[in-house]
UniProtKB/Swiss-Prot annotation:
Belongs to the NifH/BchL/ChlL family. SUPFAM superfamilies: P-loop containing nucleoside triphosphate hydrolases. It is an enzyme of class 1 (oxidoreductase). GO terms for molecular function: 4 iron, 4 sulfur cluster binding; ATP binding; metal ion binding; nitrogenase activity. Binds 1 [4Fe-4S] cluster per dimer. It comes from the Bacteria. GO terms for biological process: nitrogen fixation. The lineage of its organism: Bacteria, Bacillati, Bacillota, Clostridia, Eubacteriales. It holds the Pfam family Fer4_NifH. Its cofactor is [4Fe-4S] cluster. This is Nitrogenase iron protein 4. The reversible ADP-ribosylation of Arg-97 inactivates the nitrogenase reductase and regulates nitrogenase activity. ATP binds at G8, K9, G10, G11, I12, G13, K14, S15.
Length: 273
């Protein structure tokens, strides 16, 4: 069982990328569970056809400790098992804590079955606080992919996430598997992301082009592979799935200083920011 965490700054398209990627992996015959670790609880919407899934924390709040697995785990596209950890009530408690509670509960209820090929954690990555680092820290996820784009804040967040991975790689077995570019159509985006990934000692595992097809599929509450399996964009996600399935480059990243990050940004023409 490969346990994979997908990190990236808020709004970068992590959840969209994770769901489209897992749809591609399911098509390749993999058995998958997706655990949404984002308080927005939108990590599985496209796999479930827009079904607003009740999160683990909401279920716990309403039903107490006595929770059945099928009240928090729903099966979606390609047999993908979907769970949302959810978040605390606004202004109360810690969202990271919710992730810890959810993963522990899934373990107790026997969600991690032997027939699973992959477990994906879709994790908010602006703040690498203790709770959000939970999938890395507790040795749950062994491989991390960071979703980024050619925008400065996306790369700043990706560099910060790499610092978190570096910190926990020494004690656990966690490694960076690569950077996934979710294109924003920024100038020199491919070259910039490629250079950024290499500087970390990693790879740009796939460049996902920007496409209106993604939005179209989302409006229809589906992944692109489900909505229009013959589209070019569906093939992009299949290619990303293949690369992750076959990936063998797992590294302890070498995060860069703020100065070095800015040098790379300037070099690739983001100096007009």
């Amino acid at each position: 069982m490969r346990q994979v965490a997908i990190y990236g700054k808020g709004g970068i398209g992590k959840s969209t990328t994770t769901q489209n990627l897992t749809a591609g992996l399911a098509e390749r015959g993999n058995k998958i569970m997706v655990v949404g670790c984002d308080p927005k609880a939108d990590s599985t919407r496209l796999l479930l056809g827009g079904l607003a899934q009740k999160s683990v924390l909401d279920t716990l709040r309403e039903e107490g400790e006595d929770v059945e697995l099928d009240s928090i785990l729903k099966e979606g596209f390609g047999g993908i098992r979907c769970v949302e950890s959810g978040g605390p009530e606004p202004g109360v408690g810690c969202a990271g804590r919710g992730i810890i509670t959810s993963i522990n509960m899934l373990e107790q209820l026997g969600a991690y079955t032997d027939d699973l090929d992959y477990v994906f954690y879709d994790v908010l990555g602006d703040v690498v606080c203790g709770g959000f680092a939970m999938p890395i820290r507790e040795g749950k996820a062994q491989e991390i992919y960071i979703v980024a784009s050619g925008e400065m804040m996306a790369l700043y967040a990706a560099n910060n996430i790499s610092k978190g991975i570096q910190k926990y790689a020494k004690s656990g077995g966690v490694r960076l598997g690569g950077i996934i570019c979710n294109s924003r159509k920024v100038a020199n985006e491919y070259e910039l992301l490629d250079a950024f990934a290499k500087e970390l000692g990693s790879q740009l595992i796939h460049f996902v082009p920007r496409s209106p097809m993604v939005t179209k599929a989302e409006i229809n509450k589906k992944t692109v592979i489900d909505f229009d399996p013959k589209s070019e964009q569906a093939d992009e996600y299949r290619e990303l799935a293949r690369k992750i399935d076959e990936n063998e480059l797992f590294v302890i990243p070498k995060p860069m200083t703020q100065e070095r990050l800015e040098e790379i940004l300037v070099q690739y023409g983001l100096n007009d920011l």
